[in-house]
Amino acid sequence: MIRVYLIILMHLVIGLTQNNSTTPSPIITSSNSSVLVFEISSKMKMIEKKLEANTVHVLRLELDQSFILDLTKVAAEIVDSSKYSKEDGVILEVTVSNGRDSFLLKLPTVYPNLKLYTDGKLLNPLVEQDFGAHRKRHRIGDPHFHQNLIVTVQSRLNADIDYRLHVTHLDRAQYDFLKFKTGQTTKTLSNQKLTFVKPIGFFLNCSEQNISQFHVTLYSEDDICANLITVPANESIYDRSVISDKTHNRRVLSFTKRADIFFTETEISMFKSFRIFVFIAPDDSGCSTNTSRKSFNEKKKISFEFKKLENQSYAVPTALMMIFLTTPCLLFLPIVINIIKNSRKLAPSQSNLISFSPVPSEQRDMDLSHDEQQNTSSELENNGEIPAAENQIVEEITAENQETSVEEGNREIQVKIPLKQDSLSLHGQMLQYPVAIILPVLMHTAIEFHKWTTSTMANRDEMCFHNHACARPLGELRAWNNIITNIGYTLYGAIFIVLSICRRGRHEYSHVFGTYECTLLDVTIGVFMVLQSIASATYHICPSDVAFQFDTPCIQVICGLLMVRQWFVRHESPSPAYTNILLVGVVSLNFLISAFSKTSYVRFIIAVIHVIVVGSICLAKERSLGSEKLKTRFFIMAFSMGNFAAIVMYLTLSAFHLNQIATYCFIINCIMYLMYYGCMKVLHSERITSKAKLCGALSLLAWAVAGFFFFQDDTDWTRSAAASRALNKPCLLLGFFGSHDLWHIFGALAGLFTFIFVSFVDDDLINTRKTSINIF
């Protein structure tokens, strides 16, 4: 092969002194093969020839300075393709070069639903420097100095092949379109007609036009599948370097109805000028399964919008977002102050003692009426003393682990009762929770995932499902707005942690009154809220079905912890074991889904696990309720039917992606259990405090707003990249916040109000004896 090309080069050097001719000049390379060279004219649009067996055709077109910045498209076609329908592999190979760029055509081209015996590509055009002084100084001003377009045609078959070459020159005028007038920031091209064999290209010189940022939008009403390719002016349109340390900016976007691409200030300063191309695909299967295409070369209409942008600062929208997020914190500041004041009032002179005066023993077995309980709570809040009617409970506790001293002189008895410490006071229990292990693992995963998505081997435009119409980049991050808006989870998670710690005082007498304490569990929920912000930010580095696994486990754990909390708050203090079991289950389930995502039976495995878990929960609930079964039978039936419906849906409907099943099931069950808990409080005539009602109402309102933005569907990684790009929508607020950003903001706010509602919902029982609290 090297010998053949050396002979071709020698023949071309000799041919420079000869006149143009269409008569082939054969060079015999062996007894069985030859190379035929043809001189072609720029006026020839179509060239039809017969490639004989063991022959190589070389076609040469002389390019002078009139071809500067003109695109050249070369297409090849096998004339009678029916002869080769049974042939496998490449039949005809065509190489094209103009000295600056080159490409290779291999026919036939095989698509999923189509085999084409024609194909064509574009060459990067020649520029002024290709005819300038830096090449050869003595050529300056030489009108005969030129470049060459070389096309070689060969075949591996031992047969004659009739072929056609189509050589089209796209005039430089269409590049000049992207020159903006003074003060002009937007240019529009409407309803441009493109076909598979008729693409369109543009040239953008950012340095000449003082462009710092640039945005291109394409939209079409036709049913199409196309590729948008942008490449620096000095790089090939089709080739992509696999050298890991080579900087490049070749971007390929498949699209249907809409495509957006944004050139950042960093990209423009690095590459200066770009070429933008749009190619219509002959087959729609790469973008969508639905198509109305009748032939591979149908005309399609596409409109273009080019916007010249100024440098945008993210400071103003970020500052306004922080002001909005911190405003609810001011609402809870008086609550925190009041809690701290009350906790100081409740504290006795000796923090680990409770003193009280005895009453006759015949009163010890009497139950408190409702009014007596109210008086008891008032008395307790005022002076920290346990009233006489509670001596029975105190006596029982004293029998286990107490010290009693009696002063016989005045018959006043002092009973020393060490107060039971809550779980947060037992610092050793903190180490039993898995939070300390999860955080560094999650951070390491985020860093490694970012490195992978920014490598030269990754096509982020096809792998990452951003809303390109409202993606605001920062450095290597394509959608900084989607990342920074997760700060609400961090802020509100920290607030809930502080609030939970401040409310520890309400469990000072938890061994006697109120529901069981779960301070450490509340703190864990707040910590996972903070972890959710990190996980969601990691996901938005490159949103996809793979990255979705970073985001969802934290959501699943939070939903699970809320159910565990409300399940045990009336039975016992939740231990770290429940959190660890829940976390192991969530991680194992997500690992199972990831490991077997390509298998057809994984949904049935999930369904079996789902049935076992639901059945176990229903049986455990019935056993723990005893006489309360009749009141909760409706809930158990609704709970079972709801989960059964979910199982049927994700087994039969492919619309639910495999990675979404577990998350949606956790969320639905959490909502159902919280609704059940609230309904049971109402059925048992328990009072819900005004603070809990306020937080509950605000959480419902915030969830409604967040849900509205969540279901706007500006991306969808369950579809193809092109189909997802068709859903992209412009920013809704301040040119920075899209619908998903607003979902982050209001979702974090709704989560905070939900957590506080759950924490406050049983405050009416804080002075009620544990033996009198309803179990459900």
Curated annotation (Swiss-Prot):
UniProt entry tagged with the keyword Signal: yes
Ranges per topology, Cytoplasmic: 341-429, 503-510, 565-575, 621-633, 681-691, 763-776
Signal sequence annotation: 1-17
Glycosylation sites: 19-20, 32, 205, 210, 234, 290, 311
Stretch list, region Involved in dsRNA-binding: 22-312
Documented effect of changing residue 199 to L: In qt10; Failure to spread gene silencing signal. Loss of binding to shorter than 100 base-pair long dsRNA and decreased affinity for longer RNA species. Decreased RNA transport
Renumbered residue ranges of the record's region Disordered: 360-390
Domain of life of the organism encoding this protein: Eukaryota
Disruption phenotype: Absence of silencing in adjacent cells or tissues. Decrease in transgene silencing when combined with eri-1.
Ranges annotated as spanning the membrane: 320-340, 430-450, 482-502, 511-531, 544-564, 576-596, 600-620, 634-654, 660-680, 692-712, 742-762
PANTHER family: SID1 TRANSMEMBRANE FAMILY MEMEBER, SYSTEMIC RNA INTERFERENCE DEFECTIVE PROTEIN 1
Name of the protein in its database record: Systemic RNA interference defective protein 1
Lineage of origin: Eukaryota, Metazoa, Ecdysozoa, Nematoda, Chromadorea
